[in-house]
Amino acid sequence: MTPLHGKTALVTGSTDGVGRLVAKRLAEAGFHVYVHGRDRKRGQEVVAEIRSKGGAADFQPADLSALAEVKGLARAVLDGTDRLDLLINNAGIGSGGTAGVRQTSRDGYELRFAVNYLSGFALTRLLLDQ
């Protein structure tokens, strides 16, 4: 058993890429991992992969461009565990897509600002306040 066995982590943006790899590595090290993303199918695939190798994981969906969903994610994680030992704010969106067209979140913020900055700050504060 490692010193990390039984610890709990939330990795945002962990249904693909770096976040997925980090979630899998944390589970291998003994963490119970909350996998996060927007796509339920991909989230469940990551959870199934972790569990198939003896790890512990759950999926929590949320669209981080909406502050209400950020709050819901924090609430779901806090309701599911006694403590959160590690938060990795990995989720983000790039600059691809509709060039020159202003995109805003449901809350009226610039989309990339909402996802890449506000959501991480808000999620951290919500989890720290508990």
Language model features with spans:
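Conserved Rossmann-like nucleotide-binding pocket used by diverse enzymes
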Residues: 10, 34, 58-60, 113
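Alpha-helical segment proximal to the catalytic Tyr-Lys
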Residues: 93, 129
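Catalytic Tyr-X3-Lys loop
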Residues: 103-121
